[in-house]
Amino acid sequence: FFWYYLEENGKPAPRVEEEKDYPCRRIYAQKNNSYLFRVTYYKNRINLEVFHVLTDGMGGIGFLRELTYQYLRLKHSELSDTISDRLSEETSLNREDSYISNYNKASKSVYASKKAFLIKGDKLPYNGFGVIQGFLPVSKLKEVSRNKYGVSINEYLISAFVYATYRTYRRFISEEKPIRVAVPVNMRPFFDSNTTKNFFVMISAEFSPNKEEYSFDEVVAVIHDSIQSQMKKEHLEAIFSYNVSNEQHFAARSVPLFLKNIGIKVVYTRAALANTTTITNIGNITVKEEYEPYIKMFHSFLSFSKGQELKGTITSYKDILAYTFTSSFEDTTVQRRVFQQIAKDGIDVQIETNGVYYE
């Protein structure tokens, strides 16, 4: 009556089925034994799709990795003969609410609500889900981002998106409608947490032009400063503490759910209009040495959301990084310019798509 909540599900696990549709489709819990995730496969690829209320990217990758371990032991007797069937030590079962255990009651709002530039355009037919991936060598990326620009790989790749968007939609972007990229930050390292529940906050990398022309070097510098100014523990703590404080407030807790839903929609719409896109970096994924010969790559996708019909994810495994864009738009100019800029910096780029743009 007052809050949504999750219960332990004792029903049989959802059936693993062959992938037959676009990823990130709605999960109908009533048709899925009340589970909010699905597992599918396509040839030698295992897919995990998760409703974000269950966990964030780090929690999802942990589950997918353990699921892959279990599958490989079933498939390859040489593994099952030497490795026990127990969960690996890197798999956490911790379900602590790390927001509650770490929030500061005195925090004030640090959110920006100014509207951002939103990408618009003709949509793919039949609710199409376009995927374009660029595979890049991590060693070369690190060399270019650090030695040439003095920034992290994450900042470099976000800058490539911002610059591509700026070049494509320059006349629509202004100080009043800046390019703003929502960047999720994993809070576990800051608070020594290993929870499998959500534990992240969003910061915004902002590019607000105040002159006619910008070079890529200038955009990189702006994005670097924007991100670094927010990457302090006190600031990150204040972001989630403000949310938790509102949730814990007695007056808010006593408001009926149907009224909360109205407020949630208003807040969601404001947040959607405040960011041009979301780019999340899952980071470098490692697996136990025994399994490495059987695993080629990890990938991650984000589904679209209101106002953000083009999103990006960054995932790396060993020395290969996958920079993935999902989009509902027919036009791929932004994605193309992202990878052109990366290639211009001497980084080898191998492109793959899911074929939607050729149908």
Predicted regions and their residues:
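Acyl/amide activation-and-transfer machinery of modular secondary-metabolite enzymes
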Residues: 1-19, 34, 124-133, 192-227, ...
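Non-catalytic N-terminal regions of enzymes
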Residues: 1-92, 152-177, 282-285, 290-359
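Residues forming anionic-ligand binding surfaces in small-molecule and nucleic-acid pockets
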Residues: 43, 125, 139-143
